[in-house]
């Protein structure tokens, strides 16, 4: 089991201990820092809804370091980001690949960032199925539907032509932060917190 640091804060009722992620949640910071799957997605969605209920007018900051994962789990997070009232700023730390890159570019326009040495990757969805031929055909058709949906979402958030997105997504497409900015996945590259503070003003 991985170790999660604990921070202790003094309160009027004595000291209170938080795991580091819960403490950062108090500052409206959410971490998407693992493979995207259903349990993890449910936790992220719950945090987004909690922060909206706490203050629907205050921005949320989502830090992303993810290799991607299950498409439906990623779409659950993405849809919630679009659904809630607060603006969601996204910041890539390390990597934002596959569904991680969709979450990155799905942040509020003008508030999508990357650190200077992160890697961003987009590609078409993949899947493996076995069984009767008819069932395999059904799953293949569903995969093609998801492929079209993802292409449309990337086109929407990057403001690029759908045909260009389709071509760019055909194989694993790795980008530097500069390339991701040119592509429209992020708006700015942050080398220091001061730079983000200046942009926020």
Curated annotation (Swiss-Prot):
GO terms for cellular component: cytoplasm; endopeptidase Clp complex. Signal peptide: none annotated. Its main location: cytoplasm. Keywords: Cytoplasm, Hydrolase, Protease, Serine protease. Pfam families: CLP_protease. One of its GO terms (molecular function) is ATP-dependent peptidase activity. CDD domains: S14_ClpP_2. Gene3D superfamilies: 2-enoyl-CoA Hydratase, Chain A, domain 1. It is found in: Cytoplasm. It is an enzyme of class 3 (hydrolase). Transmembrane segments: none annotated. One of its GO terms (biological process) is protein quality control for misfolded or incompletely synthesized proteins. The active site is at 98 (nucleophile), 123. It catalyses: Hydrolysis of proteins to small peptides in the presence of ATP and magnesium. alpha-casein is the usual test substrate. In the absence of ATP, only oligopeptides shorter than five residues are hydrolyzed (such as succinyl-Leu-Tyr-|-NHMec, and Leu-Tyr-Leu-|-Tyr-Trp, in which cleavage of the -Tyr-|-Leu- and -Tyr-|-Trp bonds also occurs). The keyword NADP does not apply. Its EC number is 3.4.21.92. Cleaves peptides in various proteins in a process that requires ATP hydrolysis. Has a chymotrypsin-like activity. Plays a major role in the degradation of misfolded proteins. Belongs to the peptidase S14 family. Fourteen ClpP subunits assemble into 2 heptameric rings which stack back to back to give a disk-like structure with a central cavity, resembling the structure of eukaryotic proteasomes. PANTHER family: ATP-DEPENDENT CLP PROTEASE PROTEOLYTIC SUBUNIT. This is ATP-dependent Clp protease proteolytic subunit. It comes from Rickettsia peacockii (strain Rustic). The gene is clpP.
